[in-house]
A protein has these predicted regions:
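RNA pseudouridine synthases
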Residues: 1-153, 158-164, 171-172, 238-246
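Short beta-strand segments
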Residues: 137, 163-165, 189, 228-230
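Polynucleotide-recognition surfaces of large bacterial nucleic-acid defense/processing enzymes
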Residues: 182
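Short, well-structured beta-strand segments within conserved domains
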Residues: 47, 189-193
Length: 249
């Protein structure tokens, strides 16, 4: 027999249906190594769930102008504004972890916005992708973003905005690769779209790579702006596929 995922989870965890739905919607529930995407997904009645505890953000740098935070996956960037009471300088997708910057005064905000507009902000990401990446790749492909009530969707299109990404192979484990991605532009879902279009979709990226995992393995590793460099350490989840990741990438 089958039943809706949230009802099965409610029984397993001895919680209400609404609490079970909230956990699934937050991306914290998996079964058989894959994240449960829909609370109403029909599953076998003997399905065993794993429920992740929501990680907390950590401060990686702070001075009188800026606060740099290592955002965990499954948390919206807007939540950081509520927690720390400062405004956002950049945003990450809910599923993406890593460096998020918050400004403390308008002077720094204006200076930072100018850096972003002039493409002077250096950003690098770490990702685990499908397939074996054996050499550097460069993508100079415009991205068009379509925004709907259900969220944003991006695609490569001649009608899109310029988008440039550089991909560097770091190591391989099985049929998966750990890569570093440097970007100059910051288009919506840029890295995910460029990698998926090249056949190296990010593991856990359900939208563009049709990949299900406990999380999306994309992490904003380092951001450099106005002479300051912020680095967010990788979480232990990146060791999941047999990668022995050094402290400094």
């Amino acid at each position: 027999m089958q039943e809706k995922a949230y009802k099965l989870l409610a029984v397993q965890e001895n919680i209400s249906h609404n609490e079970a739905k909230a956990l699934i919607d937050a991306g914290l529930v998996s079964a058989r190594g894959a994240k449960i995407a829909l609370a109403r997904e029909m599953l076998g009645e003997n399905t065993k769930f794993s429920v992740m505890k929501p990680a907390k953000p950590t401060i990686i740098y702070e001075d009188e102008n800026v606060l740099a935070v290592n955002k965990p996956p499954f948390m919206s960037s807007e939540n950081l504004e509520k927690i720390y009471k400062f405004g956002l300088l950049n945003r990450l997708d809910k599923e993406t972890s890593g460096v998020v910057l918050l400004y403390k005064n308008e002077e720094f905000r204006e200076a930072a916005i100018l850096e972003f507009k002039n493409l002077r902000v250096k950003k690098s990401y770490i990702a685990i992708v499908k397939g074996i990446v054996s050499e550097e790749m460069k993508f100079d492909e415009p991205i068009l973003t379509i925004k709907t009530r259900s969220g944003a969707f991006s695609k490569i299109s001649p009608n899109g905005k310029s988008a440039f990404s550089e991909v560097y192979p770091l190591m391989v484990s099985g049929k998966k690769s750990l890569v570093k991605v440097r970007i100059e532009t910051g288009r919506t879902h840029q890295i995910r779209v460029h990698l998926a279009n090249a056949g190296f979709g990010v593991i856990g990226d359900e939208k563009y790579a049709k990949s299900r995992a406990k999380r999306m393995f994309l992490h904003s590793y380092e951001t450099e702006i106005l002479g300051l460099k912020f680095k967010a350490p990788l979480g232990t989840s990146f060791n999941e596929f047999g990668f022995e990741i050094p402290k400094d990438l």
